[in-house]
């Protein structure tokens, strides 16, 4: 049999020319892979599956990819697995495909395996692959290892910060985003607004959606035009914080010309996600008839919803309204407002101690304060308290106690609580695994304003495929 390397090298020589005869290239590569050349079928598959190529033939390209994989070509095997992942194959199908490639040292397979293990809550094995990947200076491995340091028991915010910096230096947008948040809130480093802006802008300019709104919030006083641009970009992705910010901007006529119609549009969009300030602004629009007919009953309805969602300013509106128009309700509303204000103060202190915001983390103190706020009905405190029990932060993990607090928060439509319940029921932590119930909870998280809807929608599709 002829040496298969000869036609393969001839094909590569043809491809190196600005203009080449693809029919001849195809003949040479076919001759090479038929004689057993391990890279020839993969090279032909690349050109047949190139969407920009005039010779694209996906069906033939897939056939070549399969032949290359059968001949042991690592990237052919990787691409077949990745195509299955894009088509929605569940993690339990994909993990056995990526694992041998990762063990052979393929960096891309190590990253995919690492993320799939993490998403499937196989945290210990995911951590080992993150360490391996980070050791090889892979930005994804550095990022996930930073996440483990940040959320570990105990947390190591300084190491997380250093790993985020290494990952961001290689351009990973999510690492820039996390650095921006750390500099903004003083976690693992001193507060540095200029650095926060630099990193959030680097992430946003790469199209990383979660960075849009925090960047806009920081630069609004000094660069209002750019801030409005990022708020608008985030609003196009249905970020309720961005919608609420734009509603206020259009209503006040600050940084943009006053526009009651657009204020109403953005307030309604934020309110649809149960955003407390979006609901409060909608109440103001109805109360004062800003671009619409005044409607005090509707205003009270939105203020009540906003107050239930946590808006202290909405409570103040209800207190003022009841003092003037419903004195019999004044005492009850005032007591509720005082209770909410106390719960919010407890929650803010607990959050700082939990996540080490401008202080060293203290889990025992955070747990005590979260519990007090949770017992006062603060939904975010209930969710964070559940997370502490779930991950065993400051105590032995207790899935039943975690689920109890997640369910209390979910009863108040807290989107993160719905997400956590979805994970509990999918993984069977403290309960029998129930993928259908997990999918229902995940859909509720999407419906109730979870910050990264597209990520959850992709996850929901994977879970539904596994049912």
UniProtKB/Swiss-Prot annotation:
The keyword Repeat applies. It comes from the Bacteria. Keywords: Repeat. Sel1-like repeats lie at residues 38-73, 107-138, 139-172, 173-208, 240-275, 276-311, 343-378, 379-414, 415-450. InterPro entries: Sel1-like, Sel1_AlgK, TPR-like_helical_dom_sf. Present in outer membrane vesicle formulations which are used as vaccines in human. This is Uncharacterized protein NMB1327. It comes from Neisseria meningitidis serogroup B (strain ATCC BAA-335 / MC58). The lineage of its organism: Bacteria, Pseudomonadati, Pseudomonadota, Betaproteobacteria, Neisseriales.
């Amino acid at each position: 049999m002829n040496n298969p390397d000869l036609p393969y090298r001839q094909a590569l020589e043809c491809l190196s020319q600005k203009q080449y005869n693809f029919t001849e290239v195809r003949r040479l590569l076919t001759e090479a892979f038929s004689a057993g050349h391990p890279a020839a079928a993969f090279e032909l598959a690349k050109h047949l599956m190139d969407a920009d190529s005039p010779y694209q033939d996906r069906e033939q390209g897939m056939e070549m990819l399969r032949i290359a994989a059968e001949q042991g070509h690592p990237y052919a095997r990787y691409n077949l697995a990745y195509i299955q992942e894009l088509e929605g194959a569940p993690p339990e199908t994909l993990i056995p495909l990526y694992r041998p490639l990762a063990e052979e040292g393929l960096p891309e397979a190590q990253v995919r395996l690492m993320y799939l293990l993490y998403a499937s809550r196989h945290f210990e094995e995911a951590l080992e692959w993150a360490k391996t990947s980070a050791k090889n200076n892979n930005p994804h491995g550095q990022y996930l290892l930073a996440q483990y340091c940040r959320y570990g028991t105990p947390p190591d915010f300084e190491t997380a910060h250093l790993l985020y910096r290494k990952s961001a230096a290689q351009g990973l947008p999510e690492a820039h985003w996390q650095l921006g948040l750390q500099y903004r809130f003083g976690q693992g480093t001193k507060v540095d607004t200029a650095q926060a802006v630099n990193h959030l802008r680097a992430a946003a300019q790469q199209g990383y959606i979660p960075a849009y709104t925090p960047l806009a919030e920081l630069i609004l006083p000094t660069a209002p035009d750019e801030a409005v641009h990022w708020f608008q970009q985030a609003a196009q992705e249905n970020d309720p914080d961005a919608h609420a910010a734009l509603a206020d901007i259009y209503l006040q006529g600050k940084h943009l010309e006053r526009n009651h119609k657009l204020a109403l549009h953005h307030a309604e969009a934020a309110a649809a996600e149960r955003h407390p300030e979006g609901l409060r602004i909608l109440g103001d629009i109805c109360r004062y008839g800003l671009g619409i007919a005044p409607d005090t009953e509707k205003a009270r309805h939105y203020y009540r919803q906003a107050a239930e969602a946590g808006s202290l300013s909405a409570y103040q509106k209800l207190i003022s309204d009841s003092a003037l128009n419903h004195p019999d309700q004044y005492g009850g509303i005032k007591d509720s407002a005082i209770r909410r204000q106390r719960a919010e103060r407890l929650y803010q202190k607990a959050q700082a101690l939990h996540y080490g915001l401008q202080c060293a983390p203290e889990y025992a103190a955070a747990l005590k304060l979260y519990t007090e706020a949770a017992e006062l009905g603060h939904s975010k405190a209930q969710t964070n308290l559940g997370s502490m029990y779930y991950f065993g932060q400051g105590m032995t993990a207790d899935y039943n106690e975690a689920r109890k607090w997640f369910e209390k928060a979910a009863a108040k439509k807290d989107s993160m609580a719905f997400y956590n319940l979805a994970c509990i029921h999918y993984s069977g932590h403290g309960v029998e695994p129930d993928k259908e119930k997990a999918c229902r909870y995940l859909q509720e998280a999407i419906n109730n304003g979870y910050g990264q809807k597209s990520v959850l929608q992709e996850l929901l599709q994977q879970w539904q495929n596994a049912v």
